[in-house]
Structure formats: structure tokens, C-alpha cells
Amino acid sequence: MNFWKIFFASFAAIIVATIVSTFLLISMGVASLATFGLSEMHNTKNSVLCIDFAEDIFGSPQHSAVSSVDIMNMNYSQPLTLRQVLTAIESAATDPNIKGICIRPDGLGSVSMANLEEIRAAILKFKQSSKFVVAYADGYTQSSYYLASAADEVFLQPEGSFDWRGMALSTMFYKGLLDKFDIDVEIFRPTVCRYKSAVEPFFLTKMSDANRKQLEVLANSVWNTVCEDVAASRELKKEDVMRYAADLSISLSEDALRYGFVDRLIYEDELYNLFDSLGVERDSRGHSNDISLSEYITANSFAATTVTVNDNIALEFVDKPLMAVIYAEGDIVDGDDYVDGNIFGTSLAREIRQARLDERTKAVVVRVNSPGGSALASDVVWREMVLLQQTKPVVISMGENAASGGYYISAPADYIIANKLTMTGSI
């Protein structure tokens, strides 16, 4: 009897695995076929580049195709890297086929606030080309509006929504649940490390004073930056921008218009009429010539000047000699492997060593986006960073966060560069 249970369970697992694998292959095949003709699409004159956030935007290349699958919708969507996005916007500024940019933040892709800050800065630089930048949405979240506020004009659907209510950070606690099942958790945290709050949910039922303090500082810092940038772009007073959130003054489209957050309430067809007046042509079907960010990136093959050594290190041609770009993204863990969302200490140390020993490589940039993790793995990486810095110039570029072990592995560098929205420091 047990034999047949095991047999049918294994058979069912094989069937499911086959179906999922087939779906992935078909989806990737369709995606590949969809890229045919993109060069012709890009060559269409008088087009508008649409930043629609249909795909996730990561700080580094992803290792697995599984990360490109939306399990809920069973769709395949190739994620973009921040470098690709920034390069695309920079290229569009001098591309004679691109008349301007339209920010359409209605997609389901995700992007961190720190990456949004860099994309926003790229759009502000794009505006120096004298090409137009407009934003249109059925509704704005705080993060999407942060990007949209960089546009020359911001439009909202007449019945659209507008979320502007400040920042809040929360923590889920598990101790009550663990107690019900009579489960004890052994916590190893030095008493002086009271700001190391990652373990608090397992032995506390509410937020500690130390954690509340640091989260308040973090939230206030991020919100201050957002309001400061929005106020500067929209020519508003920062105090007013913050007060509107505190008073919950804006939720409807009319509110956003009244307080100067949007310029006009228009329908989508009116947006296309605006494109006409800005020199964007229409195709044979009467649709405005637009190209999505992912299509533009694929058509231009922005990664063509990169020689991929492995999934975590790329050698960029900067005339001659070479500059190595190493990605360190995720939790720092022990071991030797490549898995999205994790930095394996042995693997990253080997890549740093490779860049150090490679005679062609004259300088190294390490992109760090990590909250930390294993002390052992961090120390293994730190040692290789020290040896690298002794032989070649090293620059750290911090992404969304570089805290604890993430900062530890960054410390030996000659220069450390962070964004205003980067969460960094040794706790």
C-alpha cells in the first residue's frame, strides 16, 4: 500500500514539474519571438518612450528564469536591471527617434525607493535635452508619484485616486503563535546590540524602544527626502507637502489638482492628442508611436558592451583597460552557490579575487545591496576586499541598503557612494 502511495505521489510530482517546465519554455519562447521586429519598432521616427513599470527592476542581473515568472498570473516577464533602465533613459536623450518620455506607472512591476531615486535623477538629466517628459496614471501611489513629479507636466484620470499619507513601518511578531505551540526559540544577540532588531519578532510581543527609535529615524529620513524632491519639482513648499500628508488632504483627483500635485485631469485619448501636438506620430492604426522601456532596451541591446564572466561579475569595456563591476545583492550567507536574493560568501570572495588577479582589470566597482547576514561569510568577503583595495582602486556603489554585514564588506573600499534613500550603517 505504501508503495502505491509513494508511486502516485512521485508520479504526480513529475507531472506537475513537467507542466511547469513546459510553461516556462513556452513563455520564454514567446518572449523571444516577441523581440523579433523590435529593431524596426525602435526605428519608427517621432516616438515616445513609455516608462510603464510592467517589469520588476532589480539592482543586479537575476540568476534564475523562475524569478521572471508571475505565479499568481502565470505570466513570464523578463526583469530589468537598474543599469539597463538608466542606460536606456540616457540613450533616449540623444536618440533622434525619441521625442520624449511618458511616465505611466500603472504596471505591476516592483522597484525599490532607492532605485526610483536613481531613475528619477536620470529623468531630470534627460529633461536637459529639451525633450518633453509627461506623466499620466489612473491613480498615483506615493512611490509612483515620487517618480512622476519629475515630469514637466503631471496628469491624472478625472476619477483617479491619489495616495498621499506619509510613511509607516511595521513589524509582525510571532512569539504569541510560538507560545501556543510551546515552541522555544534560542536567540543569540549580544546585550549591547539592542538595535539588531531582526530577531525581535521571535521573543517579543511588541516593538522595542530601540527598534521604534531607529525605524522612526529611518521613516522620517525617507519621507523628508521624498517631500523635499517633490516640493522642488512641483515648486511647492516642503512644509505644505508634508502637511497635506499629515492632514490626509489629498485622496481624490480634484484634491491633487487643487493643491498643485497634478497639472490637469484628462482622459487617455486627450493624452494621445497631446502627443500629437508634441510631434509624436501615429501608426497606420491611429495609435501613437510608443515604445515601452523593455522594448527599447531589447531593441538597443544595451548590454552588448558587457562580457559576462559569470552571473555576479561583468567586465565592462571602458576603452582599455577594463573595469570590473561586481554585484553583491541579498542576504549574506555561508557557502558557495548562486541563488537570487542571497550573497554566498565563498562565491563572492572568489569573484573579488578573480578581479584582483586579472591583469586586464584596473579598477573595480562593487554594487552592494544587502542588509547583512552571516558574520563568517561577511568576514571572508571583507578579507578579499582588503586585498583588492591594496592592489586596485575600489568604489562601492550602495543600492537600497548596505547595513551590518553589507557595510562591513564595503568598508575597505577607497570610495563609498550612497543615495539619499540608501539605508546604511553598522548596527
Residue ranges and their predicted role:
Residues E268-E270:
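Amphipathic alpha-helical
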Residues M1-A246, I250, D276-I396, E400-I427:
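Small-residue-centered hinge/linker elements
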Residues A245-A246, L252-A256, L265:
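PDZ peptide-recognition modules
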